[in-house]
Amino acid sequence: FITLYAENDEEQQEELIVREIKDGANAIILAPVREDLAVMKLDEISPGCPVIFLGPTAINSSVACSISVDRYEMGRTLGEKIAESEDPAVPVCLFSEGMAYTGNLDAYDGIRSVLDPAGFTVRLIEKKSEDTYRKAIEETVYPESGDFMAVGMDVGALSELADILEGSSVYREHVTALYGIGSTTALLNQLDRGIVKGLMAWNRFDEGYLSVEKAVQAAGGEWKEKRITLTPEYIDGEILRSGIFEKMLYPME
């Protein structure tokens, strides 16, 4: 079996799937760039071997098992944490690598389900070029623009926002708080340093381990679970330093 993932390039991902099927893969672990397109393409391709799908999807003849985190719930929980801690008078900018990418729209709907009724003004900024996020933040230094809170709706957006803010104390004066979805070692360090105020994380080690386990079972014709849902957790600096989720956040250490 083989794990396939091409970041933000669904065409390349489809080519890889077809290539590996032709080469006789016994199972495929697929982390889709775009869930909707991936499901349609799998139906067209009819891979002939079981697919372990990292994301929520309907189980069919191709998809043996789906492993996912509830993105809507993740967005809703993040929205609750923001509403508990922040002033609704400060606008919220939601930054996204693209709403078409897997899970982003669900997370967006989840966070807005809380922030809108709580009286927050919410603006969506989708990445259109390499400097989309930086330009949006640069605008805050002009008096007529005003301050805002930033939320990275995916790990790519959150990582870039954190790096931009860490590199400029001026920007940090105008972006009142940074929240987001996703965790990397770099992001956890930035959370510890206070660049990121809070983020949603889930057990990536379990996700990877389970996907391989289910692929082996499916290749051998034996598996039971059709859908596995991972539980997201909210992490802030205090929770991080408490060590409660140390095994989840740093599984290899």
Model-derived features: where do they sit?
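Hinge/cleft segment of the Venus flytrap/periplasmic-binding protein
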Residues: 114-118, 203-253
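Hydrophobic alpha-helical segments within soluble ligand-binding/sensing domains
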Residues: 66-92, 106, 133-137, 182-188, ...
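Flexible loop/hinge segments that line or gate small-molecule binding clefts
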Residues: 34-73, 184-192
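Structural motif
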Residues: 2-23, 125-144, 157-161
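Venus flytrap/periplasmic-binding-protein-like
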Residues: 51-56, 155-161, 166-198, 235-236
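Short, solvent-exposed amphipathic alpha-helices that sit
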Residues: 74-78, 102-121, 136, 160, ...
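Short beta-strand elements in bilobed, periplasmic/extracellular small-molecule ligand-binding domains
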Residues: 1-7, 91-94, 112-134, 147-149
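Periplasmic-binding protein-like
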Residues: 24-32, 50-54, 92-96, 122-123, ...
